[in-house]
Amino acid sequence: MGVLDGRVAIVTGASRGIGAEIARRFAAEGAAVAVAARTTEAGQSQFAGTIAETAAQIRAGGGTALAIAANLARPADRERIVAETVRELGQPDILVSNAAVTYFTPVEGFTAKQFALMFAVQVEAPFQLAQLVLPGMRERGAGWILNISSIAARHPVIPPGQFAGRGSTVYGMCKAAIERFSTGLAAEVYTDNIAVNALSPTKVVPTPGTIFHHLTSEGAENSEPPTVMAEAALLLCHREPRSLTGRVAYSQELLAELDVPVPLA
């Protein structure tokens, strides 16, 4: 028996990295998982990983998966993700918004198109998806919404002149917005028994994207494997909703607080 038996989950940005790891972990605990992202076939992205591969890995392990090709920047695609999930798997009990588009560019160099795309994928998409799944969650008496954030949402704790993170301002702004959205929505739906949380890695997760941007590397001291985020996400998406809601949580700290071993691989 898995802790998510009978549950239906949507995980966006699930072609690789944190999203794929969360999807596999949820499926291993019994959830039927809809994996959504743009990359459906190898060669469509400069990064390895597709939703077809994630879905195949889940099925190979005996789980249930639905691959949904979608561009999270498009409102119609967000609607289709939920509609296809409902049609093929049932009403979603869990929503994990993980999809991201990132440009590490100083503010002066940002184009209007880049800004709009980042905001659409990282703020508007989680907002609209939450709107779409909330009625079904409320009807069934419970639900779990998890928005993946980043330590970039916090102000740098060192003097500005010593801060080496030039180019992360817009990314951090988007993540700060999603954290405020998460805590505010948690208050709005508390009486409906729906948990809403934001979760960040304690350290940088080596994914194709973070490695490409030279933020970390495999086995680096400043890194943690994606399994840590997946385990923390599981905690926030299966316990009694009112017991863990309104959190801006960090993966390793959350696992330590709840006395859950940190998976290192």
Task: Report the location of each language-model feature.
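Conserved glycine-rich cofactor-binding loop
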Residues: 8, 15-16
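Conserved glycine-rich Rossmann-like NAD(P)H-binding loop of the short-chain dehydrogenase/reductase
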Residues: 29-53
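The beta1-alpha1 cofactor-binding region of Rossmann-like NAD(H)/NADP(H)-dependent oxidoreductases
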Residues: 49, 69-80, 112
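Substrate-binding pocket helix/loop in short-chain dehydrogenase/reductase
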Residues: 106-107, 114-116, 159
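A short, exposed helix-loop element centered on a Lys and neighboring polar residues
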Residues: 130-131, 183
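Catalytic loop of short-chain dehydrogenase/reductase
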Residues: 146-191, 202-205
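C-terminal helical subdomain
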Residues: 191, 198-199, 216-265
